Amino acid sequence: MRAPGCGRLVLPLLLLAAAALAEGDAKGLKEGETPGNFMEDEQWLSSISQYSGKIKHWNRFRDEVEDDYIKSWEDNQQGDEALDTTKDPCQKVKCSRHKVCIAQGYQRAMCISRKKLEHRIKQPTVKLHGNKDSICKPCHMAQLASVCGSDGHTYSSVCKLEQQACLSSKQLAVRCEGPCPCPTEQAATSTADGKPETCTGQDLADLGDRLRDWFQLLHENSKQNGSASSVAGPASGLDKSLGASCKDSIGWMFSKLDTSADLFLDQTELAAINLDKYEVCIRPFFNSCDTYKDGRVSTAEWCFCFWREKPPCLAELERIQIQEAAKKKPGIFIPSCDEDGYYRKMQCDQSSGDCWCVDQLGLELTGTRTHGSPDCDDIVGFSGDFGSGVGWEDEEEKETEEAGEEAEEEEGEAGEADDGGYIW
């Protein structure tokens, strides 16, 4: 007689236990979320699960579309179960609260944010599981040729860029082929015998300009996505130590890279800008930023590295190219620069045939202008400080001579005092 009663009691208890477990899972998911962590910015930082066994570092600049949100249907199969094309891959994929599952064919599933699905283009080839009716065109992994988008992010193909534009409802275009940042007219990186060429001052200056433009694109894109406010902690400390000239995309990028929030960038943090394959001068550039040679870059060193003035001769050449190129006036003097962007010792005007000697800053040495080639090595060689016209003196000898002269003067004054007397 008790068996039916027990059955009626067990069923409600089981339902209550199942409800408690479901509530616990929901709380665990909520606690596991990372609220406002700027290192989880979907636009250009990948998640911690993207460590590579080969690369041995966290590639924060990985293609945003090719991230861990894409799951393989084959990985979810158990044992030797045969592939069933009638099954839905989204059946075994659990997305977070704010995402919905999209089936791409019968082997792949993708969890997409609901916000990104608000303005999608409807595609009948891809099925959406949720209350959204539109979807963006999928991309095939075989068609890979990286491009740099107008938002400053690198995409594995043009299709990926178009897909991201569709997902985010943004107008994106290809800035250049290959990864970001887009190169300008790059000088040759190797000599005729195949040996690598050292990075000159002009190479480092050009690289700094490209990186600064790239950082600005990333910063603007972050503002549009509303993720700039999530870095208020590190940025507030940064603002206290940086000058006004560095409170822009340069300072913002520093706070992004400074994961330890100690206002220093060590080699591990700098390695997040993984461009060694495409920018041969990237490591020499960051090494040049470390003016104290302590193995890390401070906030002041970082700002100075990007806002330092270009060498004078190189800056003059660029000014001539910008201002004088359109006028096309004949007889314009073009200075001769060395490999580091400073003036060569001898400068010549091709139109008049006159030559003269200058210092590194381009200041003409008096009396050196002549019709021909002056011997600037002998003229400038007299000066220890190049181009100053003043020879160095031995400070110790100079101090010894001055001390001797002072001693003689004191002896002379004492003698004059002893010889003094009265005439009666």
Swiss-Prot record:
Residues 392-424 have a biased composition (Acidic residues). It is found in: Secreted, Extracellular space, Extracellular matrix. It comes from Homo sapiens. One of its GO terms (cellular component) is extracellular space. Disulfide bonds join 90-101, 95-111, 136-166, 139-159, 148-180, 313-337, 348-355, 357-376. Residues 387-424 are annotated as: Disordered. InterPro entries: EF-hand-dom_pair, Kazal_dom, Kazal_dom_sf, SPARC/Testican_Ca-bd-dom, Thyroglobulin_1, Thyroglobulin_1_sf. The gene is SPOCK2. Contains chondroitin sulfate and heparan sulfate O-linked oligosaccharides. This is Testican-2. Residues 130-182 form the Kazal-like domain. Highly expressed in brain. Also found in lung and testis. One of its GO terms (molecular function) is metalloendopeptidase inhibitor activity. GO terms for biological process: cellular response to leukemia inhibitory factor; extracellular matrix organization; negative regulation of endopeptidase activity; positive regulation of cell motility; positive regulation of cell-substrate adhesion; regulation of cell differentiation; synapse assembly. It holds the Pfam family SPARC_Ca_bdg. Keywords: Calcium, Disulfide bond, Extracellular matrix, Glycoprotein, Heparan sulfate, Phosphoprotein, Proteoglycan, Secreted, Signal. PROSITE patterns: KAZAL_2 (PS51465), THYROGLOBULIN_1_1 (PS00484), THYROGLOBULIN_1_2 (PS51162). Residues 310-376 form the Thyroglobulin type-1 domain.
